[in-house]
A protein has these predicted regions:
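Short, polar/flexible loop-turn hinges at active-site or ligand-entry regions and domain interfaces
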Residues: 5-9, 50-54, 73-82
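Structured catalytic cores of enzymes that bind and process phosphorylated ligands/cofactors
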Residues: 34-35, 117, 140-141, 174-177
Length: 317
């Protein structure tokens, strides 16, 4: 919504023209879910002043001013966001929600998350539902924006070379500190304990390749745990690489799936195993995956496997 326009640059064409003038700089919206929190904001990319053809231009200041204009000085009409902009964003969001099913692997993973976490925030899509989007008004969206500005923690990262004091002054002068109140980071609640029963859900679709997603709880294993690094090594051997047990055995040796990988979420103490299968191989693939997990639990891996996994993880950084 904010990318549509601000007071200084009231439409996307004006913003684009300004960015183009600033040596094709770029400002993009950031909207991601991490654990049970939403991270929203903007990122900016621009050329280092030393590489500009004309000396004396200060892109750090110019791009920062535009960024903060977009973020903190939006275009408001009658105490709400401009109706035409809201209508356009709602239409785009509804289309995005409807298009999720086109990516079957991502859709299956999201369905597993919804079923596994239920009404907890982690189980709710960051895009919301079509009904929620349609019901939202320009006024409600603006009030939610103001609440976000007033209460959400703000973190600013800069990657590159700059005058730190200059950047600090820009930030201090543009963040509306007078409107800030009751800012705090949300508490994190990991998914601990065993479920009462194993839940299995099948969504029937006319597809050639089925998607099998398994969600497991990892009680006591999370990003803050002392053995978090050890778990990452475990996952690399189990299903996190092309040399993993899932890939080499379930996919290559048994030919039970087109792909098979494990994806931990250390922020929520959860492990997801995703695979593409022939629908008739569902039970075989599931049992084979669990057999590889049992092999890991039994210590069926070598020192070479550990060394290779560590090297792979280090190279990823």
């Amino acid at each position: 919504m904010l990318s549509r326009g601000c007071k200084a640059y009231p439409d996307m064409a004006a913003i684009s023209e300004r960015l183009e003038y600033l040596y094709a700089s770029d400002i993009s919206a950031v909207y991601v879910k991490r654990a049970e929190s939403l991270i929203v904001g903007f990122s900016a990319d621009f050329v280092k002043d030393a590489f500009l053809p004309e000396k004396g231009e200060n892109l750090l200041n110019s791009v920062s001013v535009l960024l903060f204009d977009i973020l903190f000085d939006p275009l408001i009409e009658n105490g709400a966001f401009r109706e035409s902009y809201v209508a356009g964003e709602k239409a785009d969001l509804i289309n995005a929600i409807g298009a999720k099913i086109n990516n079957k692997a991502a859709y299956a993973k999201e369905r597993c998350t919804e079923i596994m976490f239920g009404a907890r925030p982690y189980g709710i899509s960051e895009l919301g539902t079509v009904e929620e989007v349609r019901a939202a008004t320009s006024k409600q969206i603006y009030e939610r924006y103001k609440q976000l500005v007033e209460t959400a923690p703000i973190e600013i990262f800069f990657n590159g070379e700059c005058n730190a004091e200059e950047l600090s002054e820009i930030v201090k002068s543009r963040i509306p500190t007078s409107a800030r109140r009751n800012t705090s980071f949300p508490t994190r609640a990991f998914l601990d304990g065993e479920p009462d029963e194993v839940t299995e859900v099948t969504d029937e679709m006319p597809v050639a390749q089925g998607k099998l997603v398994m969600g497991l709880r990892m009680s006591g294993v999370n990003v803050n745990a002392p053995d978090a690094a050890a778990f990452n090594v475990f996952n690399e051997i189990f299903g996190g690489s092309a040399n993993s047990k899932l890939f080499m055995n379930v996919r290559e040796a048994m030919s039970l799936c087109y792909y098979c990988r494990s994806m931990p979420d250390m922020f929520m103490s959860a492990l997801f195993i995703s695979s593409g299968i022939e629908p008739e191989n569902r039970e075989k693939a599931k049992n084979a995956i669990l057999e590889q997990l049992d092999a890991m639990k039994a210590g069926d891996f070598s020192d070479d496997d550990i060394a290779e996994a560590k090297l792979s993880l280090c190279n990823a950084y």
